[in-house]
Amino acid sequence: MKKTLYQKLFDSHIVHEAPGEVPILYINRHLIHEVTSPQAFDGLRVAGRQVRQVNKTFGTMDHSISTQVRDVNKLTGQAKIQVLELDKNCKATGISLFDMNSKQQGIVHVMGPEQGLTLPGMTIVCGDSHTATHGAFGALAFGIGTSEVEHVLATQTLKQARAKSMKIEVRGEVAKGITAKDIILAIIGKTTMAGGTGHVVEFCGEAIRALSMEGRMTVCNMAIEMGAKAGLIAPDETTFAYLKDRPYAPKGKDWESAVEYWKTLKTDEGAEFDTVVILDAKDIAPQVTWGTNPGQVIGIDQKVPNPAEMQDPVTKASAEKALAYIGLSPETDLKDISVDQVFIGSCTNSRIEDLRAAATVMKGRKKADNVKRVLVVPGSGLVKEQAEKEGLDKIFIAAGAEWRNPGCSMCLGMNDDRLGEWERCASTSNRNFEGRQGRNGRTHLVSPAMAAAAAVFGKFVDIRYMELN
């Protein structure tokens, strides 16, 4: 039987399957952070259970921590409790933890790949919805709830129903200035935020293959935003080059054996997908969301849609509600929308290539007077170190931006970095839901270059026509 990549990964990890029952999968890698793990460890203690595979579980601190201080004693409230609990739980169980004093610390979906913890062919879970990021390596990776975190800690397995398979093919080459973020936003705009529900998506096509691993991670990161269980990209030479010599990647003969196996991780020719979506890369413009979900997105050269022209009553009602919240009128030109804040960071766009793209735009320029704050938050200590080695921090600071320590930051209103009421933000994060970046905050999702351009011009501009330094 010819199989898709997803089917190969799923079937190779089944440890038990009985008629009429949901299969049980073996989990190769479990990543944890301070927000969704405390109750899971409490559950283990109450039941008198141990962590089954300590060497397959790794922790970091990212969601609730401050990006301004590195001292846990200077944290307050829930953030301090969560960080101390994770530290205590990891020490008690022997789990490796990249804490706030480690330069390996970072956003869990940035830290995992750069350490080589993410490898092709693995099953990877984390108590975080954007675990799909790791699918960029040809791994079956998905987010789980806290009760499932406890189950994986105790058994290194998880009950998991089979999903449908979806292929999204992006044919041809993108135009100059078009990034992975634009590609995935365009995909979600076409499929809608529910288009992938019940599916695991495999991204393919020339435009996907041309992406770096960092770009591929951006694409898979947002698979969940189209309702998919996970996103996948088959591994290739780009994948292997990225992973070679990473701290936790195989070494020597083990590396050679691993690569031989990884080369088999691809969809068989003639395998059938349940759903197929095709996009032409040349049609993708820089993307900007106009509403309150990632599927409400258009090209920078378009105008805000008019709900009155929408035929579907549900879509129409959603658009009307979104425009009322976001404070925009139908037919508004995106290039007429000014912003109050800019956020460059998150597990979607905080890697070194993202920061380089933003710095290229901001070099020699200053943030616009109407922009109150520009936050640039690297995804890990290693990204921060590399950026500073290249002088990117100096470019951002000279432009009037704030250069911060690693963390999830303003992606979500769970820490000190958030929007004021009704402030509008150009953000490189992955969700533009109501209140996501702070109470009544208004979020527009864009690429790092587009966010940087909004910072220096004070409004959205078409990056394709900018003179870059």
Curated annotation (Swiss-Prot):
Residues holding [4Fe-4S] cluster: 347, 408, 411
Keyword Ion transport: no
PROSITE patterns linked: ACONITASE_1, ACONITASE_2
Keywords: 4Fe-4S, Amino-acid biosynthesis, Branched-chain amino acid biosynthesis, Iron, Iron-sulfur, Leucine biosynthesis, Lyase, Metal-binding
Documented EC number(s): 4.2.1.33
GO process annotations (BP): L-leucine biosynthetic process
Cofactor: [4Fe-4S] cluster
Record's catalysed reaction(s): (2R,3S)-3-isopropylmalate = (2S)-2-isopropylmalate
Protein name: 3-isopropylmalate dehydratase large subunit
Upper lineage: Bacteria, Pseudomonadati, Pseudomonadota, Gammaproteobacteria, Pasteurellales
